[in-house]
A protein has these predicted regions:
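DEDD superfamily 3′-5′ metal-dependent exonuclease/proofreading module
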Residues: 1-181
Length: 181
């Protein structure tokens, strides 16, 4: 799952697009108009039997919770998994992971574009789809690395904390590290 918004502030910048993939090489794009309820999307996000894979889940979960009132669960975050499994690098962006783990070049050219437009361009649609098409394959690679380094339990604990981290973010404590001295 990925989201596209008008900016990076969930309170100011509306959710415009949600991208989904089952890992079958296809992507479903849900364009959200203002005040759209998205009942089927909400049902899927809340479905406990479906693992939701994100890259930087913290942001997408906050946007989805704020915009649709649903906290996605259960979740897997490829960015967190990468940080725990790939401690030899500081390159944990989706573009870097796709290149280094899958040999796939992702274009980020449309990342900052008008996602609120009534009609999205083919370039925007291609970009949006590419952001979810490889998440399942990345999860598999990262999961193998986490197992190899005996860090899968730590990753699961981080994923379990994400809803709390998101609630802290949404309540105004985005820079709070509750564990800091």
């Amino acid at each position: 799952i990925d989201t596209e918004t008008l900016g990076l502030n969930p309170y100011r910048d509306r959710l415009c697009l949600v991208q989904l993939s089952r890992g079958d090489g296809k992507a479903e794009l849900v364009q959200l108009r203002r005040h759209y309820e998205a009942p089927e999307l909400k049902r899927l996000l809340a479905d406990q039997s479906v693992l939701k894979i994100f890259h930087f889940a913290r942001f997408d979960m906050a946007v989805l919770k704020h915009s649709l009132g649903v906290m996605p669960w259960p979740v897997y975050c490829t960015k967190i998994a990468s940080r725990l499994a790939r401690t030899f690098t500081d390159r944990h962006g989706l573009k870097d992971l796709a290149k280094e783990l899958l040999g796939i070049e992702l274009s980020k050219q449309q990342q900052s574009s008008d996602w609120g437009a009534d009609q999205l361009t083919q370039e925007q649609l291609n970009y949006a789809a590419s952001d979810v098409l490889y998440l399942h394959a990345l999860k598999e690679k990262l999961e193998a690395m986490l197992v190899r380094e005996d860090r899968q339990g730590l990753a699961q604990a981080c994923f379990a904390f994400l809803p709390t981290r998101v609630e802290l973010d949404l309540k105004g404590w985005s820079d709070l590290d509750p564990f800091a001295h």
